[in-house]
């Protein structure tokens, strides 16, 4: 197969529709302005070649007519973004995927599968990964768990990498001999073969060492404790942690908060700061600080609601 055929195969999704995007030179809030729309015709080999040649940008719809997917993605809209740091985190968690630069400088993290998997299963695992990365609010593709084809649903598309492949800004970043490399299209295709995984194995990947240590903790706290809590959000994180510990361990929540402060906070809060939080929490029942940082970036609502 040639490169266009390989790319078409890798991004197999909804059979009877695809996306197209026209990008302008103007920028708004760091993003390139673009006009995107659904075309109710299949994504063909000719269209993929046109994308590679820089004539017409296309996107693929991950969810198919049976509510399954063979690829998925996280769309991280953060500018500027350290793509290398993102790769390091993903490698730490042993997540098989490819980080690509998006058209505006953010990141599309692509996952590829050897078999079709339920879109709902992918979205649940992707939410766990995004929370661990500190991008819990990013978009997940497929954006739907289920579509109703009989009423005309087609799902949302994601723009594909390697538009105008010879001089593209939408390239994959891969590690080669300890260095980060802007991959050519052929290297990207090779990388896809390396990261493709059976869905059941993907779903079993443990995300973060603290998942095993604290399986009953809410997802944001697992992620924060796994990566460590640093200056800039320690007091809010300690308060949030205290709210959880009070509910989960009513008899010894104070000592557990002190233990976490000593082990997981860098540098630890002072004794007086911890006591102040404990005294405040004793006065009345408080809600979680879900919408505040650093918790909101590590949020996994779908799991949290089940706990």
Q: Which functions belong to the PLM regions below?
A:
Residues 1-71, 79-88, 154-157, 162-165, ...:
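DNA replication initiation on ssDNA origins
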Residues 88-91, 105-108, 113-122, 164-169, ...:
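Modules that initiate DNA replication and primer synthesis
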Residues 93-96, 127-136, 263-264:
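A common structural junction motif
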Residues 73-74, 97-124, 148-161:
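Histidine-centered divalent-metal-coordination microenvironment in nucleic-acid enzymes
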Residues 130-168, 190-200:
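Flexible helix-coil linker/hinge segments at domain or subdomain boundaries
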Residues 136, 158, 172, 179-182:
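Extended, Lys/Arg-rich, non-catalytic nucleic-acid recognition/anchoring regions
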């Amino acid at each position: 197969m040639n490169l266009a055929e390989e790319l078409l195969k890798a991004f197999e999704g909804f059979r009877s529709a695809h996306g197209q995007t026209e990008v302008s030179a103007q920028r708004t809030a760091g993003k390139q302005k673009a006009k995107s729309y659904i075309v109710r015709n299949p994504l063909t080999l000719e269209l993929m070649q046109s994308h590679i040649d820089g004539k017409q940008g296309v996107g693929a719809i991950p969810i198919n007519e049976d509510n399954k997917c063979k690829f998925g993605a996280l769309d991280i809209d953060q500018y500027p973004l350290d793509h290398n740091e993102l790769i390091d985190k993903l490698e730490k968690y042993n997540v098989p995927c490819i980080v690509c630069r998006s058209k505006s400088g953010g990141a599309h993290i692509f996952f590829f599968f050897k078999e079709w998997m339920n879109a709902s299963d992918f979205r649940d695992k992707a939410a766990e990964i995004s929370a661990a990365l500190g991008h819990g609010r990013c978009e997940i593709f497929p954006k739907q768990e289920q579509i109703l084809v009989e009423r005309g649903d087609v799902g949302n598309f994601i723009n594909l990498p390697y538009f105008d492949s010879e001089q593209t800004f939408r390239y994959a970043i891969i590690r080669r001999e300890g260095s980060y490399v802007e991959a050519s299209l052929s290297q990207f295709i090779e990388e896809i073969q390396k990261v493709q995984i059976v869905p059941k194995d993907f779903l079993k990947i443990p995300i973060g060492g603290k998942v095993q240590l604290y399986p009953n903790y809410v997802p944001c706290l697992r992620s924060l404790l796994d990566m460590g809590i640093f200056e800039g959000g320690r007091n809010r994180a300690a308060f949030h942690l205290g709210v959880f510990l009070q509910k989960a361990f009513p008899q010894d929540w104070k000592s557990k908060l002190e233990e976490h402060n000593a082990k997981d906070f860098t540098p630890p809060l002072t004794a007086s700061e911890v006591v102040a939080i404990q005294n405040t929490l004793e006065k009345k029942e408080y809600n979680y600080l879900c919408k505040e940082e650093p918790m909101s970036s590590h949020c996994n609502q779908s799991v949290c609601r089940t706990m």
